[in-house]
A protein has these predicted regions:
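Conserved beta-loop-beta/alpha segment of the NTase-like Rossmann-fold superfamily
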Residues: 2-69
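Conserved beta-strand segments of alpha/beta enzyme cores
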Residues: 4-6, 78, 137-139
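Hydrophobic residues at beta-strand termini and immediately following loops
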Residues: 8-10, 82, 141
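Residues that recognize and position ribonucleotide moieties
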Residues: 35, 96, 121
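Conserved core of the sugar-phosphate nucleotidyltransferase
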Residues: 43-118
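Catalytic donor-sugar/metal-binding loop of nucleotide-sugar-dependent glycosyltransferases
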Residues: 129-142
């Protein structure tokens, strides 16, 4: 169509979480710069740009306690850690931009996670979080 938007059907939607959804979309992600949108978010403003300087994940700030996936940033403003739960924290929320360079590193790990028993209810972000923490290599070596 005019904007080259792809809507994908995931036959595992009722029994698996978003890891399976992004796994199903992997051929559209390889070698491309891609936005991923959450189906339950509404964007008031046009968020698309003809150029993005790199991969990013949007975030929102929560005052007080939260059970969301909270972010820690390094001095350059890049995500350096993610933990479930926090206080007065930025958390993962909304659209994501995956650069082809990021996807080249991330997709092989996501594909391997999809094959591991027990990952059926993983969010697609779990392999990324495990990569940040150095746990992805360990998990993959043990399976």
């Amino acid at each position: 169509d005019k904007y080259d938007v792809k809507l994908l059907y995931n036959p595992e939607y009722s029994c698996k979480n978003t890891l399976a959804t992004v796994y199903r979309a992997r051929k559209f992600l390889k070698g491309r710069n891609v936005y991923i949108l959450s189906s339950d978010n509404w964007m008031r403003e046009n968020m698309y740009h003809s150029y993005e300087c790199g991969a990013w994940y949007s975030a929102a700030h929560e005052e007080g306690e939260t059970k969301e996936w909270c972010l820690t940033f390094n001095k350059k403003g890049r995500i350096s850690d993610v933990n479930v739960g926090g206080k007065d924290a930025w958390f993962m929320y909304g659209p994501v931009y995956l650069s082809r360079e990021f996807s080249a590193k991330f997709l092989p790990v996501l594909e391997a996670y999809y094959q591991i028993p027990g990952t059926e209810q993983f969010y697609w972000e779990q392999p990324y979080v495990d990569m940040l923490k150095g746990e992805a290599k360990r998990r993959l070596e043990n399976n």
